[in-house]
Amino acid sequence: MARSLKKGPFVDHHLAKKVESAAGSKKPIKTWSRRSMILPEMVGITIAVHNGKNHIPVLVNENMVGHKLGEFAVTRTFKGHGGDKKSGR
């Protein structure tokens, strides 16, 4: 279910403050807020999004606006399905 338009996009307050202050900075903004939506003000900024283990740097571009930060930092690693161990010999 989508968020109501009258409520507007959700962005954590601490992340919004960091984005405002890091307008021309090259240093990535470290955040644990995967639920925050990407706003047009964030375009061109590198945000390091936590995936549960470490921070994944995400360079925000205009195609990402409207999506959430967590969509670009994968939390699960697929190692492959189990195969027949005898065929490897």
From Swiss-Prot:
GO annotation, cellular component aspect:
cytoplasm; small ribosomal subunit
Q: Which UniProt keywords apply?
A: Ribonucleoprotein, Ribosomal protein, RNA-binding, rRNA-binding
InterPro entries xrefs: Ribosomal_uS19, Ribosomal_uS19_bac-type, Ribosomal_uS19_CS, Ribosomal_uS19_SF
| One GO-annotated biological process of the protein | translation
Is this entry keyworded Ribonucleoprotein?
A: yes
Give any GO molecular function from the UniProt entry.
structural constituent of ribosome
Any one Pfam family here would be Ribosomal_S19
What function does this protein fulfil?
A: Protein S19 forms a complex with S13 that binds strongly to the 16S ribosomal RNA.
The record's similarity note reads: Belongs to the universal ribosomal protein uS19 family.
Q: What is this protein called?
A: Small ribosomal subunit protein uS19
